[in-house]
């Protein structure tokens, strides 16, 4: 999906349109928001436009059911690489489907090592995504943002799921090695608000949940983009 924004120029001819490229799974798609309701991506785009007083061009590369390995693989596609290179802001959601698959296997085998394997797999793929983005951007381009949304727990009654998600989120936080990169604490946003923020499927956010996610992204600030 491509949402075009009209380009504005300063007197010196500098392009003042910001590009936002969103990568991910069903959360980036906006599943659960309701008919004609935007997910967090479109809401965050609007908040950026308000906060920065700039037009924002949006490109979304996402599909329900994608695992982190699929999202990493997308970064090898020439058109997506081009849009990542141009992007001022990049958001990534992932690992939710890896979690769901792990839960299904655990219910059959009762072996919690399946969660550790999934966590290690997700961490490796997220590291690969950031490395690939860095390669695409090159050393000279540092004026951009990458926002990684960590996992919330849609299954608060499953103690092992919460333990696994919390552990994964701690490891994800360690990827904030560069000033452009921030991990957004979606877990804290949903903790204790599952009834309020989850859709009828009890897995994906509803409209209020996506709004809370967008506000959390906004609260992370805009770094060098605001200078």
Predicted regions and their residues:
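Short, well-ordered amphipathic alpha-helices
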Residues: 41-48, 75-76, 127-135
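Structural motif
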Residues: 65-76
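Residue-level detector of flexible, active-site-proximal loop/helix-junction positions
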Residues: 27, 65-67, 153, 190
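Short, solvent-exposed loop/turn segments at secondary-structure boundaries
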Residues: 32-36, 73, 158-162
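Serine-esterase "nucleophile elbow" of acetyl-processing enzymes
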Residues: 2-64, 81
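Alpha-helical cap/lid subdomain in secreted, periplasmic
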Residues: 79-207, 211, 215-226
